[in-house]
Amino acid sequence: MAVGKNKRLSKGKKGIKKRTVDPFSRKDEYSVKAPSTFQIRDVGKTLVNRTSGLKNANDSLKGRIFEVSLADLQNDEDHAFRKVKLRVDEIQGKNCLTNFHGLDFTTDKLRSLVRKWQSLIEANVTVKTTDDYLLRLFAIAFTKRRPNQIKKTTYARSSQIRAIRKKMTEIMQREAASCSLAQLTTKLIPEVIGREIEKATQGIYPLQNVHIRKVKLLKSPKFDLGALLNLHGESTTDDKGHKVEREFKEQVLESV
């Protein structure tokens, strides 16, 4: 007989069931707040395990990234094809204060833009904002028919594509390097850069559907709580200090 564990002895009683614990009873709910650059500040709720022992709930929340439709943040269905990434940087009570972490297009929108009989032009540029955020911007554009054009196709020549791509990189570099991350976000929402590119390249070849299709955050500067609170409109710092009244003054004895 082989020496080993006796399975019959180790078995428990058949009628006893294990006590099930609801995992949500150990979790807390936190509100996710978007920066003040967006119209709708309340993004939603997120769950996290309660602070117990050395495990802190705040540490688990910091660094979380949420992907939200820009249509929900701006309360406008015209922005439904764009997704914004928000990263949790600070916890204030039961609120998670987020910052802009990136932007992207939905796959179905990108697929719908690509059509026959036109040239697709793409460009990307790596740029640093005035508040030291390193970003990579990706632009996309398509050629369109000139006024009174009879020919079906609108293919641009290689020299024209190179000239358009150069203009695209120059405009993206100029617009992003001259402002902070919050100011760049306000430019990205109404697609100011896309319209600027369309206007600048009119003399080379007419373009349509010019978009900044993606913004990728490569590197962030050292975390600044004051800047984040200003971004959320919750800064309480004043230029002047408040006078402190002394209620009790200690008497100094001349001789002991």
UniProtKB/Swiss-Prot annotation:
Pfam short name (any one): Ribosomal_S3Ae
Entry-annotated residues carrying N-acetylalanine: A2
Swiss-Prot/TrEMBL keywords: Acetylation, Cytoplasm, Ribonucleoprotein, Ribosomal protein
MF-aspect GO terms: structural constituent of ribosome
Membrane spanning residue stretches: none
GO terms for biological process, alphabetical: translation
Domain of life: Eukaryota
UniProt feature, compositional bias: Basic residues: 1-18
Cellular component per GO, a single term: cytosolic small ribosomal subunit
Subcellular location: Cytoplasm
Coarse class of the protein's main subcellular location: cytoplasm
Region Disordered, annotated ranges: 1-20
InterPro entries recorded: Ribosomal_eS1, Ribosomal_eS1_CS, Ribosomal_eS1_euk
Assembly: Component of the small ribosomal subunit. Mature ribosomes consist of a small (40S) and a large (60S) subunit. The 40S subunit contains about 33 different proteins and 1 molecule of RNA (18S). The 60S subunit contains about 49 different proteins and 3 molecules of RNA (25S, 5.8S and 5S).
Family as reported in the entry's similarity comment: Belongs to the eukaryotic ribosomal protein eS1 family.
Protein name in UniProt: Small ribosomal subunit protein eS1
Species annotation: Aspergillus terreus (strain NIH 2624 / FGSC A1156)
